[in-house]
Swiss-Prot record:
The keyword Cell membrane applies. Keywords: Cell inner membrane, Cell membrane, Membrane, Transmembrane, Transmembrane helix, Transport. The gene is ampG1. PROSITE patterns: MFS. This is Putative transporter AmpG 1. Pfam families: MFS_1 (PF07690). GO terms for cellular component: plasma membrane. The chain crosses the membrane at residues 5-25, 42-62, 78-98, 104-124, 143-163, 171-191, 230-250, 254-274, 299-319, 324-344, 354-374, 393-413, 415-435. Belongs to the major facilitator superfamily. It is a multi-pass membrane protein. It is found in: Cell inner membrane. SUPFAM superfamilies: MFS general substrate transporter.
Length: 443
């Protein structure tokens, strides 16, 4: 049975996840752009969010390892949340004394570590959320979680950029540390009313990893050292992927499973790539056009989030009448065309009306594509390994966000803003062609 305390906890989970992702994401990106850090450098620093791409690898650790002393006081899950939160508070407080102009390398390194612990905390919260919420309440609590997530994002992005009119970012990051401290205290107080935090159970998805190591170790003796370990890694990955994706539903049983898994992974990376390239460069672009902090905070961040929510609702309604593959193809085409508005904005210069239309159209269509994207991933996951399947597939979105945008700054410097946005429109085509290739094979 779903308790009121569970609702508060789920909202807090969503809030802190959305809040943390902005601390080392868009808000830090804006700070870099405001400090006139080179576009090439800003693009390269997208790697800071890389830990979010591999957080599924951390899950077995948090499921099995106990923190000796904290575990006795707070329980297994809450002790991990406490440890990651206090670490985040300390790191963010240290970061608040640095300046991107003079301490860029150290600041970026600390931001990367912050992302690591934020991603780790997300993994813990996701596992805990599935344990304390009854299956019949998953839909309702997902809405509560998303609401908290959006509120956290707004405060840490739009709110922070608006505050930068009156405060330095050093002061704002000290406030960030304070918010996480208050969150931790609230979570501990609310958690005292439920025993759900102490639940531990075996995860069959992760128990299979050990068996994959055994498979990988077969027939690798008496080989050259480097080749031996290369083959070990290759065999482990093959055994792991083929097993966890063996539940995928395909129309034919004789198709090459590994081939289509690779195509699906490539599609998931490329489909989100245009948005991720733009997200890294959007703050420098708007500052380049002459927009101030208030305009960016209100139109681009606040209205952008509202547009994404509206787009998500529209996408959900359309998918009630159209299948997922049709929707993700249609939404992808519409969203790609929306990027043309950025070219119009660059041609016309600072224009509030065009900016509002551009952000509105891009955000709404982006919300539609994201809804179809998540639904597509969810529809692929079958069998007892569906949790691991979902974690791995959704991590492709993180890879697209953290690795490939490294080149975005170089693209702008060498080819200009108009060609950059034209590229983000065209790059959608390969992902849609891959979708057409695989859609005949997937149920």
């Amino acid at each position: 049975m779903l308790k009121n305390s569970h609702i508060y906890i789920i909202w807090l989970f969503g809030f802190i996840s959305g809040f943390n992702v902005m601390i080392t994401g868009n808000t830090l990106n804006y700070w870099f752009a405001k400090k006139d850090i080179a576009l090439q450098t800003i693009g390269m620093l997208s790697f800071i969010t890389l830990p979010y791409s591999i957080n599924f690898l951390l899950a077995p650790v948090f499921d099995t390892v106990q923190i000796k002393y904290l575990n006795k006081i707070l329980g297994h899950r809450l002790s991990w949340i406490c440890l990651t939160s206090t670490t985040l508070i300390s790191l963010i407080f240290i970061l608040s004394f640095l300046d991107p102009s003079t301490d860029l390398v150290l600041l970026s390194f600390i931001a990367f570590i912050i992302s690591f612990f934020s991603a780790a905390q997300d993994t813990i919260l996701s596992a805990l959320r599935t344990k304390i919420v009854p299956k019949e309440s998953l839909g309702f609590t997902s809405g509560i979680y998303i609401l908290g997530y959006r509120v956290g994002m707004l405060l840490a992005s739009s709110g922070a950029i608006y505050l930068s009119i009156y405060l330095t970012f050093n002061a704002i990051y000290k406030i960030f540390a304070g918010v996480i401290f208050v969150y931790l205290i609230l979570l501990i107080l609310v958690a005292r009313y439920t025993n759900s935090f102490d639940v531990m159970e075996e995860n069959t998805s992760y128990s299979y990893v050990a068996r994959c190591y055994a498979i990988a170790d077969m027939n690798l003796k008496n080989k050259f050292f480097i080749k031996n370990y290369f083959n070990y890694f290759k065999n482990f990955i093959s055994a792991y992927l083929l097993k966890i994706f063996s539940g995928f539903y395909f129309h034919r049983n004789d198709i090459n499973l590994a081939y289509y898994i690779i195509l699906i992974l490539i599609f998931l990376v490329l489909y989100r790539l245009p948005d991720n390239l733009i997200n890294v460069m959007i703050n420098p672009f708007l500052l380049h056009l002459g927009y101030n902090a208030f305009e960016i905070a209100s139109v681009c961040k606040f209205c952008g989030v509202m547009g994404a929510i509206i787009g998500g609702l529209i996408g959900g309604i359309i998918m009630k009448y159209k299948n997922i593959l049709y929707s993700i193809l249609l939404f992808g085409i519409i969203h790609a065309l929306s990027h043309i508005f950025f070219i119009l904005l660059e041609i016309n210069g600072k224009n509030s009306l065009i900016l509002f239309i551009t952000i509105g159209v891009e955000s709404i269509t982006g919300g539609m594509t994201m809804t179809a994207y998540i639904a597509f991933i969810s529809s692929l996951c079958q069998g007892k390994f569906r949790a691991t399947q979902y974690s791995l597939l959704s991590s492709m979105m993180g890879i697209s966000r953290s690795i490939f945008p490294i080149i975005s700054g170089y693209m702008v410097v060498n080819f200009g803003w108009q060609n950059f946005f034209l590229f983000t429109t065209i790059i959608t085509i390969p992902s849609l062609l891959i979708l057409l290739k695989i859609k005949t094979k997937i149920n």
